[in-house]
Amino acid sequence: VKAYEAGEKPDIYVGGSSEIRHLGYSVQKSYEQIEELMEEIIRQQNQRRKSEMDALQSQINPHFLYNTLESITWMVEAHKNTDAVFMISELAKLLRISLSKGRTIIRISDEIQHSRSYMNIQKVRYKERFKTEFIIDEDVNDYCIVKLVVQPILENAIYYGVGNMDEDDGGKITVHGEKKDDDIYITVEDNGMGMSEEVVDNILSDNEKVPKHGSGVGLINVHNRIQLMFGSQYGLQVYSEPDEGTRIVIHIPAIPYNEQNRVELEKQKYGKAKVTDEEK
C-alpha cells in the first residue's frame, strides 16, 4: 500500500488465508481502476485542449475574412455603398460574437445572430444562389450553448449541399431551434447534393475516411466540444442521402443562461455543480 501511495506499482502476492487473498485482490483491483480512471481523465483533458484550440483557430478563418474584405472592397469600388455598409455591419457582429470576451458558453440568441451574420456574408459571396431561413422558437433564446457550433454545420450545408447549385435550382438552408422537455434541438437542413453513407458513417469520427477539406473536421470538433461540455448523451446527429440533402441536429441540455450557470459550465463542473433556473 505504501508503494502505491508513492506512485509505484509493486507486484502483489495473492496468497495465504482467504481473508488475505481477498484483501490482495481488492487492493490490486482498486489500483487497476484508479489507473483506468487516470488514463480516462488524461484522455479527456487532451481532447478538451485539442478541441478548444481547434475552436479558437476556427473563430476567425483567414480565408473567410479575406474573401469578405475583398467583397467589401469590390462594393466600394462599384459605388454600392449601402451593400458595403451592410457587409461591414454583419462582419462586425460576427467578430464580436466570435470573440465574446473569451467566453465558451453564450446565449443561444447570440449564437443564432452569429449564424445569421455568417450566412448573410456567404450569400453575397455565392451571389444569392441559395436562400436561408431561420425558424427559432423564442423560448430557446435564453439558454446556454457552446459558442460557435452552428457555423461549421452551415459551412457543411454550403460545401456539401447548396454551394454548387444554380440559382434556379432552389437551394435552401433552414435552421430550426426548439425546446422539448429538458433538451434543446437545433437543426440545420439543406436540400443540396447530400453525402454518401460512408461519409455519414465516419464524419463524426477520427476515421481517415473523413474528408479533411471542407468542414468534416469542423463537425468532429463541434461534436466533441458538445460532449466534453455536456456529456456523451449529447452532440450531433447526421442524416443524409446523395441528391436528397442533409439534416444535422445539435442536441444539448436546456440550461438557462445566467452568470452562475455560465461560470459553472466553463469550469467543467456540469453534472456536479448546481445549475439554476434564475435569469440574470
Predicted features and spans:
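Two-component histidine phosphotransfer core
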Residues: V1-Y239, G245-H251
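C-terminal end segment of the histidine kinase catalytic
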Residues: L236-K280
